[in-house]
Structures are given as structure tokens and as C-alpha cells.
């Protein structure tokens, strides 16, 4: 963890925020702040649901391997690209409910993620460290790199790269403005936003992959306690930008201007 990690700006009290960021390639750079703190997952849990379904389909959870059905593909697209909750309800059941999602988590290395036992998947809890571990598994990196089959990893990433424009905020704010080809959405993302009934305060979280300084990065930013949705989105985006900037040499440099870029190949590029 770089020495300036503790000085990353925090959210407006009473909000909390945690983050974990790392290059996609197995490199030593990383940054974490409160990465083991527990947060309500909201719709970032939808990536976990899809990964759990994929494991079930590929036969990794003691079930016979089979093909993904056309209905499951349609639900998955709606759940990730548009954050459709009805589709998430259906896939939660298809993935085996809380028991199936929990079993998948053991394989994926998300030890501190707790699936809600009553079917209210958005109230499952997780940590930024677990979300980073899940992203690494989805991208075929780290000790769980072979848990998901190649087709499953590609499926999850493809859908996270197709999230509708109105939901492409969050960690994508850390991407270089010209890191991707013209007209191509920036990176892969899934966001969560949820006002808590008891307090009216917002859970705002974002996970995904972006390209910055010529390198792909995996980021997870979880937060809660925001008085407005807009305040939470701004805090998450600021934290994502500052975390990646602290890990690169691009501070103050606009990638649209001529000049040398950092080494490493850029890789290809989702609420309630």
C-alpha cells in the first residue's frame, strides 16, 4: 500500500468509504483503504450472482454441467446491463439462492461476503477486498484464476462492458478519457445504489475495470451513509480517481496531449 493511501480524501460524514485497487497484471502496486470493512452490497451483488450461476452451469458446485439457457442469458443481460431487479431475483434462484451463492463465494475467494438468507440479495454484505478478489477471478488472475471457465469469464466481462450509459458512473471516472477507442464505452463496471429504509441514507458502490496510464486496473469502491445519491456518486468517483492516480505517473497529465505513456498493454474494456 503506498504511503499516501491514508491521505486519500474521505466522504462527507456520516458516510463511510472503502476501496481496493490493483493492476490487472500480477504487479506489486496496490492501494487499499478500509478494504475489510463490511458494507451492504446493493446491486454490485449482481456480479456475484452471475458468477454463481456460471459456476453452477459449468458443474463446479456438484451439479451436472449444462448449457446456459436462452432465458438465463436474457435475464443476465437485463441484470447487469440495466440492473434489472426482477432478473436478479430469477437468477438468484437459478444460482441456488443464498446457499448456492455462498458455495460459489467459497470457490471465488470472497470469504467475508454474506449472502442474505431471505432472498433479499441486495442486503447481502461484502467488502472491497472481496470485490477485488471476485474481479480478479472474473479476469482470470490470482489464485482463483481458473475457477470460472473461460466462457464464463468472457460472459461476465462482456455484460459489464455493455452497461447502459446512465449507469456508467463510478470507478469509470478513473479511466483516461482517451484510453478506449472512440465511441467505445469506458471499461467494465457494475454499480449499486440503495437508500436505506431506516435512515434514508444512501449506499453507493462501484466495481470494475478501467484503463489508465496505458494499463488496465481493477477497482472496488464501497460506501454508505450519504445524504443524497449524488453526494455518494461524487465520493466514489473521487476515491477511484485518486486511488489510480496515486498508483500511476499520470498526475496532472492529460492523456490527450502528446507525450510518453507508461508501459504495459491496455486491455479491452454496470444499482438498484
Residue ranges, per PLM feature:
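A general structural signal for well-ordered alpha-helical segments in protein cores
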Residues: 47-50, 88, 236
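Short alpha-helical patches at coil-to-helix transitions and adjacent helical residues
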Residues: 44-47, 81, 85, 124-132
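Short, structured coil/loop segments at alpha-helix boundaries
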Residues: 33, 62-72, 84, 145-157
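Acidic/histidine-rich, surface-exposed loop or edge segments in extracytoplasmic proteins
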Residues: 29-34, 50-53, 81-85
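A short glycine/serine-rich beta->alpha loop
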Residues: 33-40, 117-120
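Active-site SXXK
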Residues: 38-64, 79, 219
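Penicillin-recognizing serine hydrolase domain
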Residues: 1-28, 93-272
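Conserved catalytic neighborhood of penicillin-recognizing serine enzymes
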Residues: 58-104, 127
Amino acid at each position: 500500500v503506498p504511503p499516501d493511501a491514508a491521505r486519500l480524501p474521505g466522504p462527507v460524514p456520516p458516510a463511510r468509504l472503502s476501496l481496493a485497487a490493483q493492476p490487472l497484471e500480477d504487479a506489486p502496486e496496490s492501494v487499499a483503504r478500509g478494504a475489510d470493512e463490511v458494507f451492504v452490497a446493493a446491486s454490485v451483488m449482481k456480479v456475484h450472482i452471475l458468477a454463481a450461476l456460471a459456476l453452477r452451469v459449468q458443474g463446479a458446485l456438484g451439479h451436472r454441467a449444462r448449457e446456459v439457457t436462452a432465458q438465463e442469458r436474457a435475464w443476465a443481460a437485463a441484470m447487469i446491463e440495466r440492473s434489472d431487479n426482477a432478473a436478479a431475483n430469477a437468477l438468484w434462484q437459478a444460482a441456488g439462492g443464498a446457499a448456492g451463492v455462498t458455495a460459489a463465494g467459497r470457490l471465488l475467494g470472497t470469504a467475508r461476503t454474506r449472502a442474505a438468507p431471505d432472498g433479499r440479495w441486495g442486503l447481502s454484505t461484502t467488502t472491497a477486498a472481496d470485490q477485488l478478489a471476485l474481479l480478479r477471478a472474473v479476469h482470470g488472475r490470482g489464485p482463483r484464476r481458473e475457477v470460472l471457465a473461460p466462457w464464463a469469464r468472457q460472459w461476465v466481462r462482456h455484460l459489464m462492458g455493455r452497461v447502459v450509459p446512465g449507469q456508467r458512473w463510478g470507478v469509470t471516472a478513473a479511466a483516461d478519457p482517451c484510453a478506449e477507442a472512440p465511441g467505445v464505452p469506458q471499461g467494465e463496471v457494475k454499480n449499486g445504489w440503495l437508500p436505506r429504509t431506516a435512515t434514508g441514507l444512501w449506499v453507493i458502490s462501484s466495481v470494475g475495470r478501467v484503463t489508465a496510464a496505458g494499463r488496465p486496473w481493477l477497482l472496488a469502491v464501497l460506501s454508505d451513509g450519504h445524504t443524497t445519491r449524488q453526494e455518494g456518486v461524487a465520493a466514489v468517483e473521487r476515491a477511484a480517481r485518486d486511488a489510480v492516480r496515486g498508483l500511476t505517473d499520470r498526475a496532472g497529465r492529460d492523456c490527450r496531449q502528446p507525450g510518453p505513456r507508461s508501459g504495459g498493454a491496455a486491455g479491452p474494456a454496470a444499482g438498484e
